[in-house]
Amino acid sequence: MTEIKSPRGTADILPVEQAYWEYVRKYAGDTCHLYGYQRIDTPVFEETALFIRGVGKETEVVQKQMYTFDDNSGTSITLRPEGTAPVCRAYLEHGMHNMPQPVKLFYISPAFRYERPQLGRFRQHWQFGVEAIGEADPSLDAEIIDMAWRFYQGLGLKELSIKLNSIGCQLCRPSFLEALKSYYTKHTDKLCPECKERLTRSPLRLLDCKKLSCRELAKSAPLSSDHLCDDCKNHFSQLQHYLELLDLPFELDPCLVRGLDYYTKTVFEFLPREEGAQSALGGGGRYDNLIEELGGKHTPAIGFATGIERIILNLKKADIAIPPLPTPRVYIAYLGEQAKEEALKLAAELRQNNISAITSLGSRSLKAQMRQANTSGTAMVITIGENELKNNTVELRDMVNAEQRTIPRDEILALLN
């Protein structure tokens, strides 16, 4: 019979890995609460139309990377490839525009993209993302970037750079796109096959290509900064002022773009300093037109997202110490059926008093139970045997200093509390 394994591009998160995941998730939530963000959870799947309208019909995400199927009613459904469009859909559906603006939300959830699996990149991956909807002021951009920076720094990832750019708005971007098309049309012979395809449907993405020949071309490509309207120039200038005010070490990168059509004005990424431009930990930007594209009123917004798997990869690479997960305080070993019943009762009593306890629940030898206790990392072992039952006592062993003593059964709670 063929062995069934996890699908390509996915990974089981085993107990031995959970300390990293708990560490990152908890710190993400704690950071969000410091900045006044509230958690939101949206469905794993949405109607496909949401991503076609929101992410962009011509994007590679929609064209090549989505997991899409018809459900039994014939509705086209897609496993979410990213978190921003679903949050914006929820913002509209639940009338959040009536709340004090900006509405500040965060999520920690899986996303699905059919991509070539590689180190730190999976077809199902976990994202931590934040969205601030309902404010155009560049100080909000600065706050989001500051929040992401403090998050990475707090985790221990200190050797990072912040890349920053403005890709303009609906008024000024068309002239920039035309300049890009004109420039690259003269150099199509040097473009990789993917960029030749992108030239007509998504010329911005040519600046983002990681192929060497395309990167060389990008160095001489037109700059978005030369095409910004006055409003976008002022917005970008103010943002840089606020980032300097917050002492954030940003670098302007004229080739920085994002892979989704909804981005406007500010775009940014965080990169490990030693790895170069192909290893972004996370990024984000403004999407001032997305709510309107989905049927709402014009509503400025900005967001940020980061892949948790990639964060953990960098934590391990930097050899950053992670707090261990809690282990049970007490292991209860026993000898005989009657002692087993007493062990069950005692374990229940300890748990009712918020003392974590485990027991073997099998017919292992005492030696095997002690090995299990040692492996579990418990601080104390309680042993119940025939003599202990007869005398209404237990044997208590401190696993740290190897001290052992006999105590009355009814003194256990007082001793452990």
Walk through the language-model features, giving the residues of each:
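TRNA-recognition modules of translation machinery and tRNA-sensing kinases, especially anticodon-binding
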Residues: 1-372, 376-416
